[in-house]
Amino acid sequence: MVRILDGIPVRLLALMVMGLLFLCLEAGYRLSHRKPGLGDVSALQASVLGLVALLLAFSFSMAADRYSLRRSLVVKESNAIGTLYLRVGYLPEPSRGEMRAWLHRYTDLRLEGHEAANEPALFAKKLQESKLLQTELWSRLETLAPRIEAPVLILVTQAMNDVFDVGEERMAAAHNLIPTTIFVLLLIGMLCSGVLLGYRPEAPLRGLLSWSLFVVILTAVMFTLLDLDLPNRGRIRVDQEPLRSLQEQLRAHP
């Protein structure tokens, strides 16, 4: 399911949040000078900030778990393709050479696709090409099945299933994001804390320096979380080095 947040550029979203936080701080300041009567404002400020911190910690934990899963699946896919490549060596020629060439191409497509995850059209194109190669590999194995021994067929079939399965696992992990509801709750908590921090009936002037620090730090933390959660945009990306290393190994030992 595509979230609303995914369709908005990160910089624009950051500017919007910063603007909203400044507006909430200003609203709290003006409210405190029009109706100065809120008693335990400091206790309320601490409570709301504590809730925001709790939500941030919970969200970071979720995002970190998802990021770790995506990273481990890269290793798993690399190992699965490498195992299938070796087991294809049990098959007779010319199928062995053709299937290994297809696995070379399959590795290239998987690597190129995930490295271009921030370009949806190119990513979809590479993914579709890799699925066509999966069909070719499976069809060739079905053709060979009557002519090869059962133990060899079982080994190759299991390895091929693992390659196909981990590809689907990576797609599922890429779409397993923190729910939009949590980000909305986090934003509401941040805006409420902005109103409460701006509520300063004893202060004749606005605390622009403290306001700026509050807005910049809170926005930076929230968008680091968003960057960590989204695999197809931002600066925090899953390293594709295991697939890159496999690609080099396959080229060195065809």
List where the protein language model places each region.
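Alpha-helical transmembrane anchor segments
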Residues: 6-35, 172-254
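Short, solvent-exposed segments of well-ordered alpha helices
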Residues: 43, 64-68, 72, 124, ...
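Structured inter-helical modules in multipass membrane proteins
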Residues: 84-175
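Short extracytoplasmic/periplasmic juxtamembrane "stem" segments immediately C-terminal to an N-terminal membrane anchor
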Residues: 74-90, 239-254
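Transmembrane signal-anchor/signal-peptide helices with a preference for the extracytoplasmic
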Residues: 55-75, 229
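Loop-to-helix transition at the N-terminal end of transmembrane alpha-helices
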Residues: 37-49
